[in-house]
Swiss-Prot record:
It is found in: Plastid, Chloroplast stroma. GO terms for biological process: circadian rhythm; L-phenylalanine biosynthetic process. Converts L-arogenate produced from the shikimate-chorismate pathway into phenylalanine (Phe). Involved in floral volatile benzenoids and phenylpropanoids (FVBP) production. This is Arogenate dehydratase 1. GO terms for molecular function: arogenate dehydratase activity. Its EC number is 4.2.1.91. Residues 1-52 form a transit peptide. Induction: Circadian-regulation with peak levels occurring at the end of the light period in flowers. Triggered by EOBI in flowers.
Amino acid sequence: MQSLTPSSGVNLKSIIRKTSLPPGQTRFITGRVIKCGYQVDSANTVNTAGAPASYNSGHVGASRADWQSSCAILASKVVSQQPDTEKTGGAGNITAVNGHKTLDLVSIDNLPKALTITDLSPAPMHGSTLRVAYQGVPGAYSEAAAGKAYPNCEAIPCDQFEVAFQAVELWIADRAVLPVENSLGGSIHRNYDLLLRHRLHIVGEVQLPVHHCLLALPGVRKEYLTRVISHPQALAQCELTITKLGLNVAREAVDDTAGAAEYIAANNLRDTAAVASARAAELYGLQILAEGIQDDSSNVTRFVMLAREPIIPRMDRPFKTSIVFAHEGTGVLFKVLSAFAFRNISLTKIESRPHRNRPIRLVDDANVGTAKHFEYMFYVDFDASMADVRAQNALAEVQEFTSFLRVLGSYPMDMTPCCPSRDE
């Protein structure tokens, strides 16, 4: 897989430089803190017929004038500005560690800073370089997924999943690449909830093999470690291997894997290791104590690519469609599944999430009295394009006995083999 190389930071006031990039190079941006009171209403629309004919595949901004006007109004809600707090440590004179007189660490201040929810303000018109938002800091697996999905993109780090959604909605980014499930850890529930709350469309997917490494400051040996920090899922995916390495360490959870590596480098922590990628070690000046420490070599994370507008469904290649629906009454879920089964459409995923607007449903029964049931939203992926008549008829039938139905996207399937290769 093509590696990403960050360049120097760019002021968020100018957002993006209108310069072209040579093939294979990815550029990052940084920003000042801008507080913006923007919120997104829940999307309760029903879209079962795929993308309208006016939508252009791969094209963003069919209603750009309206978006720019809306963004200008939102920008007027800016209430304050404050400069980024300077970070210290990580690049100065450091006490010797196991014979090493100095540590040649990357200056944290020279790396791109993740956008926060207060940084969001409308971006000006931009050039042809595609800007892709992801959650985390440089070196995160989401950054690698963004580079795999859009090799020549300009990657924009965001500190939260919701910030990545809003970055696309406010034209700061053209796309967002966010994880939705892992082959070992399961679904990323937060992003399923955000898919329903925001009005973005799934336009593609990418599957990324995950190869964890144990990282520490140069000169630090494994027997000197007292704790290991990383994202909770990363720690869980490496639990057996960490034990086999003979490490008597405490496990502590942080927001993301690359953020753990950045934290160790910035604070010169000699008793702490991070579970992160090899790229994170390179970026933050850490050494790799052990490679491939995931318990299962077939560790794969699935990411979805999000845009403001859907793409036109096609029939010339395998497509996948994602929907979400709510139901009322008995036997509705069986009827929904039957609508696909009768048309020989394979379901690849079904996920239930609590219905936030109606968490509990009361059912009065003359025999047993009043019963309380949890209400759920169901997320379903199936192998068919919305251009397929079978899919159109299936959703038309589903809509008849569901109280809510929304098509999240119909998009090409990622057909690349997910072979666990450390060189990827």
